[in-house]
Amino acid sequence: MDLYSIKLKVITILAGIGIALLFSLIAYGLLYYFYGLSGISIIYFLLIFVLFIDIIQWLVSPYIIGMTYRLQKVSPMSQYGYLIDIVHDAAEKNNIKEPEVYIAMRGSPNAFAYSSPLAGKRIAFTKSILDILNRDELEAVAGHELGHLKHHDVELLLAIGLIPTLIFYLGYSMIFSGFGRRNGGSFFLVAIILFILSSVFNIMILGVNRIRESYADVNSAMTIPNGAENLQNALAKIYSYSMPSKQTSNSTVNMLMFSDHIENDLGRDYRKLVEKWKNMKPPVSIFSDHPHPAKRIQILERYKNSF
């Protein structure tokens, strides 16, 4: 593991811990100020309630994703059986257990990995991505997705994703707590501040996700032969052939995608796109859940001879 990948790992861990600690201090201070010791029981109740909902969602989400994307499990004898071999080879190189492989019958070119205690670990490729990437590029994409599983990114998103929801419910409860009180206006003002803080924490989580995506790219470059160059080509092909979209979401499913499909020029030669991204200054967007492809390409460029 090189210095940059260690840096990405440490930043991800510290960011997650920092977000959790910041939330704890804000929640504890506000509840103690307005409710005294009884306010601490409120946050415990909210934490247990939201945690229960999130765990249920985590357990059943693979089945919901399966229905949404019309996922079909790949069998060795099917026309997509070669995907099992690709994922098997990539999993061996990553020293992790091979996940189940699925094909998504709908959706633009993409891939994603997800897991739960009930469904186990899974990796899915959309049918359209198979039409534009060669075998080596698919293995590089698999190396990226397996990086998410190896780094326990699903669990990380579950943990820190609770925080904006908790802050929102805390603000919601303070609105009702303020009714009929002499200082009800203060409760309402704090509730508005909490709603704003919920959005701020969402932006912070998007930042963590961008780091997480870069770390998965580095994982592919360091574990898959020629992974850096093949992942660069895969990114360029996906952005060249995907329908343009400006939609940004911080949903867990969108965060787990390999690409977020920013607006692009259809039909552009992917090699020219790679060269352009190598030399451009990547724009910064705090509202994006993926790094700009130029930033991803430039990070991968550092790792072309790292395998």
Swiss-Prot record:
CDD domains: M48B_HtpX_like
Catalytic residues identified in the record: E145
Membrane topology type: Multi-pass membrane protein
Binding site for Zn(2+): H144, H148, E213
Record keywords, A-Z: Cell membrane, Hydrolase, Membrane, Metal-binding, Metalloprotease, Protease, Transmembrane, Transmembrane helix, Zinc
Major localisation: membrane
Similarity comment text for this entry: Belongs to the peptidase M48B family.
Name listed for the protein in its UniProt record: Protease HtpX homolog
Biological source species: Picrophilus torridus (strain ATCC 700027 / DSM 9790 / JCM 10055 / NBRC 100828 / KAW 2/3)
Origin organism lineage: Archaea, Methanobacteriati, Thermoplasmatota, Thermoplasmata, Thermoplasmatales
